[in-house]
């Protein structure tokens, strides 16, 4: 029988686990300000391609898929390619990141995410030298590729799943967590809610 006032084995285990979690350092790739910066970049790129590059959404491909289907339904096959190419570039970006991850996972001198960030910054310089109008398709393909690279590489902030190139999922999760908070009044849930809504605001 456990001595009164002393935690049981199960309680000690839970307490030790909580202390361990509190002292585990947050990875740089999951830090709040890095994710905030990436989220602002994601929001800017969506505005940039839609306003200045022919009304194409570079980040989330839902809009492009809808417009692709609409153009096909209306018989505008050639115009539909305008939306198909960014979708294909997005898919290639996902595959590219997985290749980078597999190739450099054990590389001790450089983390694979550092390679991704360097590549993203380099590629985002190119549209500045590509004239609006004549190069819109190429720019949209390039930015869709970059956004796929970002969303596949940076998927967590402080251990929580998050998206840095779109806000629908973040908005859904934050609102869902409100329901749980109203029932539990758990402080950690409240912090998660705040974090998700902050990312939505940074995207805006």
Stretch-by-stretch model annotation:
Residues 14-204:
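Alpha-helical transmembrane segments of multi-pass membrane proteins
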Residues 3, 11-14:
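Acidic, Ala/Val/Gly-enriched low-complexity intrinsically disordered segments
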